[in-house]
Amino acid sequence: MDILLQQIINGLVLGSMYALIALGYTMVYGIIQLINFAHGEVLMIGALTSWSCIGLMQEAMPGAPGWSILLLATLIACVVAAALNFTIEKVAYKPLRNSPRLAPLITAIGMSILLQTLAMIVWKPNYKPYPTLLPAAPFQIGGAVITTTQILILGVTVVALASMVYLVSYTRLGRAMRATAENPRVAALMGVKPDMVISATFIIGAVLAAIAGIMWASNYGTAQHTMGFLPGLKAFTAAVFGGIGNLAGAVVGGILLGLIEAIGSGYIGQLTGGVLGSHYTDIFAFIVLIIILTLRPSGLLGERVADRA
């Protein structure tokens, strides 16, 4: 029972990080029907930028509290990620908005590889130990433990979802997003600026990805130029699982995928008679993706809609 409780906690934390990343995927897809496969690399840039900032600030302000250094590094990383995603949208995606669907998809994959290569040049290919800036003493919950970083991850996910729901439902930008998603041409006739809305969506997605990247690096204690690929792919799976284009679906899909993966990693050895170990847990995400695409392509909370021309 203690093992199950621990895996549930681990799954909620893992799922929360998937959910943060999936929110970026689902917002962009909801507006312009684009799967931004470079989204995971924005996560990586955010994490590595914060790692660099933390190192510089620890040298410049040796007596500063860890939480203040982490907060300042997070703010800088979010600005860098937002500027990067804004530039990617303007340079790589905007010229292809009226192109066949395959063109922006291939461009997104190419941008992902380009960002990985640039990050490898700037930060080198070795793993960077990510510093522990929050209290390390874990809290006991029954027979399981949860760290301060994990509690922060859960809290940030709740705040992020609430903020996104409020933004989309109750703000002027949110109304413009919904109008642009419905029909960009009609939205433009009503005074909405689709280009501004799309740019804002990419910026918001980048901020969420940067925060998720910092949380990921903090939780696992390392950062590297390829760190965004697999979490990004799994977060895309989570977005499809929940219903891509649906904010609540992104979070539900992320949490469920995290739970499936964490619980599976705890019991995969027993289920396979010791043939497979916990390092095979990545297969669970893609088994879920295959099942969902087969049984319910629109996802758990997605609506069945006709494909746009």
Mark where each language-model region is.
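Transmembrane alpha-helical segments in multi-pass inner-membrane proteins
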Residues: 18, 70-78, 202-209, 215-286
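Transmembrane helix-bundle core of multi-pass membrane transporters
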Residues: 95-96, 101-170, 197, 263-282, ...
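Single transmembrane alpha-helix segments in multi-pass membrane proteins
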Residues: 4-54, 87-103, 239-247
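Hydrophobic core segments of alpha-helical transmembrane domains in multi-pass membrane transport
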Residues: 47-52, 77-84, 111-119, 156-165, ...
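Membrane-embedded helix boundary and interhelical linker motif in transport proteins
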Residues: 31-87, 91, 267-275
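Membrane-interfacial amphipathic/re-entrant helices at transmembrane-helix boundaries
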Residues: 1-21, 49, 60-72, 99-103, ...
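Alpha-helical transmembrane segments within multi-pass membrane transporters and channels
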Residues: 61-111, 118, 252-257, 261, ...
